[in-house]
């Protein structure tokens, strides 16, 4: 876990541009900076003013835009606000997020110095290549997409089936906009393009939160009593054991502090993208939006 404190950004002293005062006020001139303290969208304000929740929205956006597995970015390591995030150096990002650290750092610098009020900011900024390698089962127990089961006793913890092996995502990236930073030999080696990599073409089942929820609904025999359909034809569903679902999602993301309150906040991220919708006046009830895929009966 990153401790709150003032990290020093590692910028190249030879580059005059990076030593000029930030010009984000012009780039964000049409955005309401103060809205960040009242639930505003993360891309509408400068990162310096993000709340902890908006930091997580930004991380989720990177996962979705680059089609990365949720395990690529450890959200629990970024339980910090925007001021702390902006003070972190590349080395601190790498320590917190491993190979994904360079991606996070570069995108944050782009936002800080070339701020835009746009949710499509990252699509043209990075070309991400993902490859997988087999890892020994003793290292970690993780989700097995085709055989995930839940403890029907619903005790204090809910165990997943152990997977024999898992794929660890390794990220190598090239940027269309380069920021001059001091490079160590190890960093330079990480930036060398991999010899044989394959771009990830689609997400496996359960990669993102809404898919995770969908897959529980689609497997009622394997996942009894957690979530149920209220109206299958309309995509309306209800959480029956909300904390149990939150524990499962937390285990999938290696976040032991996950609660339903945090999970429901993350679900609100999908409202704007019309993947999930509110169901007013009904507690624990949600609806799949027009952009959600794979939940309808007989849908290919």
Swiss-Prot record:
Please name every pair of cysteines joined by a disulfide bond in this record. none
Domain PNT, first and last residues per copy: 29-115
Keyword Amino-acid biosynthesis, does the record have it?
Answer: no
Alphabetically ordered keywords of this record:
DNA-binding, Nucleus, Transcription, Transcription regulation
Note the CDD domains from the entry: SAM_PNT-ESE-3-like
Q: Name one GO cellular component term.
A: Golgi apparatus
Superkingdom assignment = Eukaryota
The role this protein plays is: Transcriptional activator that may play a role in regulating epithelial cell differentiation and proliferation. May act as a repressor for a specific subset of ETS/AP-1-responsive genes, and as a modulator of the nuclear response to mitogen-activated protein kinase signaling cascades. Binds to DNA sequences containing the consensus nucleotide core sequence GGAA. Involved in regulation of TNFRSF10B/DR5 expression through Ets-binding sequences on the TNFRSF10B/DR5 promoter.
Disordered: region residues: 183-202
Instruction: Give the similarity note.
Output: Belongs to the ETS family.
Gene Ontology BP annotations? epithelial cell differentiation
Do you know which PANTHER family this protein is assigned to? ETS (PTHR11849), ETS HOMOLOGOUS FACTOR (PTHR11849:SF171)
What does the UniProt entry state concerning the protein's domains? The PNT domain acts as a transcriptional activator.
Localisation: Nucleus
Could you cite one Gene Ontology molecular function of this protein?
Answer: RNA polymerase II cis-regulatory region sequence-specific DNA binding
Q: What is this protein called?
A: ETS homologous factor
Q: Which InterPro entries match?
A: EHF_SAM_Pointed_dom (IPR033071), Ets_dom (IPR000418), ETS_fam (IPR046328), Pointed_dom (IPR003118), SAM/pointed_sf (IPR013761), WH-like_DNA-bd_sf (IPR036388), WH_DNA-bd_sf (IPR036390)
**Keyword set includes Transcription regulation:** yes
